[in-house]
Amino acid sequence: EYHKNILLEAIGEYPLITISRKSVNLGTNIVDTEPQSHFNMYRQILRASKLVTTPFVATAESDTLYPKEHFNFYRPPVDAVSYDMSRWSLYTWNPVFSLKRRISNCTLIASREYLIDALEERYGENSKCPPERVGEVGRHIHEKALGITLRNAIEVWCDVPTIQVNHENGTNYREAHHPKRKRLGEIKATEI
C-alpha cells in the first residue's frame, strides 16, 4: 500500500497501466499469467507499451520508490531511451545502500514508438531471440550478442534519486541466484 501511494503521488495525472499476477483496481490492469522470468517481464512491458496513449513510456516497478521529479525532469529524443542513473539500491540481506552505474528498467523513459520497435525486435511474436538472453534496451553487450539493432541509450541524473529495494522475492534474485551476484555499487552508504 505504501509503495502504491508513493507511485500515485509521483506520477500525478499521468495515466497508469499496471501488470500484475492478480487483477488489481489500479489504472488499466493487465493480468500476467505467464511464468515469471526476465523474458516474460520484457514481453509484458511490450504488451503494456502498445496500450499507452501518450508519446512517452516510463516504466515503474513495485519495489522501487519514485519521487515526482523522476517522471518530469527529462524526455529523451524520439530515437533513444533514457535511464535515470540516480538510483540507490537497498538490499534486504545487507545493511548497506549503494549507487551503481548500471542501467535498469525501473528508471526507463522512452518514446513509445521507439520502445515498441526495440521490444518487438527482441520479444515480439516473430523474434528469434532466445529467452535466456535478455537485457535492457540500449545495453549494447546484449544487442550485439543477439545480432539485433543497437539502440541509443542516454544516461541522465535526476536531482532527487529513486530507491530500488532488492529482495528475495524479486525476479533478479531467483534467476541469477543472488545475492552472490548482486554486488554493491561503487558508492556505498549506511543511511540515505
Where are these regions (language model features)?
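Short, well-formed alpha-helical segments that are part of the catalytic scaffolds
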Residues: 1-10
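Short, glycine/charged-enriched secondary-structure capping and boundary segments
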Residues: 2-3, 27-32, 72-75, 96-98
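Conserved glycosyltransferase catalytic-site signature
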Residues: 38-45, 62-64, 130-137
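Short, hydrophobic beta-strand segments that form beta-sheet elements in well-ordered domains
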Residues: 12-22, 56-58, 81-83
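Short beta-strand-to-loop acidic/aromatic patch adjacent to the donor-nucleotide binding site
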Residues: 54-67
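Conserved catalytic core of nucleotide-sugar-dependent glycosyltransferases
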Residues: 71-191
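Active-site-proximal specificity loops/subdomain of glycosyltransferases
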Residues: 17-55, 70-72
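Conserved protein kinase catalytic core
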Residues: 26, 67, 90
